[in-house]
Amino acid sequence: MAKKVVKTVKLQIPAGKANPAPPVGPALGQAQVNIPSFCSQFNETTKDQMGFVIPVIISVYEDRTFTFVTKTPPASDLLKKAAKIESGSANASQTKVATITHKQVEEIANLKLPDLNAYCVEKACKIIEGTARNMGILVKD
């Protein structure tokens, strides 16, 4: 018989840097999960993605065990890295802060494809271009 999921926790944690401090500790402490065990497993799983914030979905079962699934980094983080900027524009419609190529958008779309609501790379590129536009990043051909 399958274990019953008691709680699902969604967090965004820097890759390889999970520790019992907030936000990880309080979120998992409420679910009575072994926090050091989660931190070590998460850090081991994400050590090759250092520098990115990784979304994670943690399923907590009634016997206090857990499983977690990591997702790809947020599109905004990938776009900021590609454009070599710290943050997007405060007024994206009038102020453009950077320019990236369509090839860079395609690389990001290929990376994000499993987590996007799209079945082909062309549609995924449109989603990423929309995110870039909202951040004040110009996409050139």
Curated annotation (Swiss-Prot):
Pfam families: Ribosomal_L11, Ribosomal_L11_N. One or more lysine residues are methylated. Transmembrane segments: none annotated. SMART domains: RL11. GO terms for biological process: translation. InterPro entries: Ribosomal_uL11 (IPR000911), Ribosomal_uL11_bac-typ (IPR006519), Ribosomal_uL11_C (IPR020783), Ribosomal_uL11_C_sf (IPR036769), Ribosomal_uL11_CS (IPR020785), Ribosomal_uL11_N (IPR020784), Ribosomal_uL11_N_sf (IPR036796). GO terms for molecular function: large ribosomal subunit rRNA binding; structural constituent of ribosome. Keywords: Methylation, Ribonucleoprotein, Ribosomal protein, RNA-binding, rRNA-binding. CDD domains: Ribosomal_L11 (cd00349). The keyword Ribonucleoprotein applies. One of its GO terms (cellular component) is cytosolic large ribosomal subunit. It comes from the Bacteria. The keyword Secreted does not apply. Belongs to the universal ribosomal protein uL11 family. PANTHER family: 60S RIBOSOMAL PROTEIN L12, LARGE RIBOSOMAL SUBUNIT PROTEIN UL11M. NCBIfam families: L11_bact (TIGR01632). Forms part of the ribosomal stalk which helps the ribosome interact with GTP-bound translation factors. Part of the ribosomal stalk of the 50S ribosomal subunit. Interacts with L10 and the large rRNA to form the base of the stalk. L10 forms an elongated spine to which L12 dimers bind in a sequential fashion forming a multimeric L10(L12)X complex. This is Large ribosomal subunit protein uL11. It comes from Onion yellows phytoplasma (strain OY-M).
